[in-house]
């Protein structure tokens, strides 16, 4: 009888330890992780830092808020909200782009892109990331599910580590934390 009690205690103890120390199978909500609250919002990651400021996706292209471009990528862009124009000064002249247009002027020469350069939603101005990239030393890549854009603007050395085996990337350290990706 005492052996049977020890076996039951061993099984219960083993189940408890298994439950306590085995990894969680819970997947984290990536929209919550990136702070996405609306369908057209795009999370912005600059140099591996997730920003609170969000971008928007229009016609399949990412657009950044003017303030985000000015504060994090290139402070030489100027948005005139009274005239609804975007200005950018180069040594050879000033670029001027009107809201809702795919054309811009440089020294009275009209040029065009295959996308709208600047859009507005209420009082917020959004600049096409492709246009920002033309005049800023950045690279970017967009990702789906959830929508996000990763921008690299710092070209220094990046510290990396080699992974020894396949494992899940978790939200916080520890096996009980929800995983972000497998």
Question: Over which residues does each language-model region extend?
Answer:
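Primary recognition of N-terminal secretory signal peptides and signal-anchoring hydrophobic helices
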Residues: 1-179
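Conserved PDZ fold ligand-binding element
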Residues: 182
């Amino acid at each position: 009888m005492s052996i049977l009690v020890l076996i039951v205690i061993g099984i219960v103890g083993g189940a408890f330890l298994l439950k306590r120390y085995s990894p969680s199978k819970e997947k984290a909500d990536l929209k919550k992780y990136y702070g996405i609250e609306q369908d057209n919002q795009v999370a912005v990651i600059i140099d591996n830092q997730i920003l609170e400021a969000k971008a928007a996706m229009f016609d399949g292209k990412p657009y950044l808020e003017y303030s985000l471009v000015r504060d994090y990528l290139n402070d030489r862009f100027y948005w005139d909200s009274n005239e609804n124009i975007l200005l950018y000064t180069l040594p050879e002249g000033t670029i001027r782009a009107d809201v809702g247009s795919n054309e811009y002027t440089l020294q009275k020469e009209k040029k065009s892109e295959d996308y709208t350069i600047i859009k507005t939603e209420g009082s917020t101005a959004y600049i096409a990331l492709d246009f920002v990239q033309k005049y800023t030393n950045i690279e970017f890549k967009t990702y789906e599910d959830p929508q996000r854009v990763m921008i690299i603007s710092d070209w220094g050395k990046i510290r990396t580590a080699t992974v020894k085996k396949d494992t899940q990337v978790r939200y916080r350290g520890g096996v009980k934390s929800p995983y972000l990706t497998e």
